[in-house]
Amino acid sequence: VNIPEFKVRVFKEDEPIHETRVIVGKTHTQTPIFTDEMEEIVFRPNWYVPNSIKQNEIAPYLRRGGGFFSSGWDTSVLRRQGLRIRGANGRDIDPDRIDWSRNDIRRYELYQPPGPRNVLGLVKFRFPNTHDVYLHDTTQKNLFSNPVRAFSHGCVRVQNPDKLATVLLGHDQDWSAARVSSAMHNGADANKVFIKNRIPVYLTYFTAVADENGELKQYKDLYGHDRRMIAALNGRPIPAGLPDNVTASSGGGERRVSRRSRRGDNPFAGIFDF
């Protein structure tokens, strides 16, 4: 994956055999740069909500209104998005039976079972890592038409996940496109297919790349990594975490738009773009 290019490529013996568009993390929820090995492909996966999203995006909304069993807790939004809550005993819990003003949401497992609303779509590609980042399908196919595709919480969404799965499992286990399609659309839920020969995965950040014809292609410094590196080499370091178009000065000029004004009145709209 080359983050600034919004592309993923598969190489076999140093030759590219497949490429497709991807969506990467926003400037404030960046896709990390690291290397790991793909261990499994999961068809019709569950989505387990990360603690960061539980605590920062879901909990504040659930706690509105105060008292126990208060109608101010609009837990119906969980049901509309197909989210379920599971306790320590492994059983699902009615969210209306929880005092959200007293209980830490991180104590509970929030998950979205397989289905048409699942934010991971029909397949995910796992390479277990400390960042909890992976490649996956998405229900928001329309976003792939954007030239700048930084919309996720850090994971990488793949435009043609069926073709990617066919390339990888075809090489590893002789799977056909028809078998992949069947697993995605008609197969068992949470069906894990383990990779026999682990596949190296590189999440990279190259803003200048030579194409197959030797022509130089340049891409925007999406996360400002190049800018910070140049500044550090010139003896004027810039704080980490600033995107490419934001300076370290306090002069302002950057226009900030609240999530509510950008996404309407649905406070959960920002969650389901994982």
Question: Language-model segments: which ranges?
Answer:
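Well-ordered beta-sheet/strand-loop patches within structured domains
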Residues: 1-274
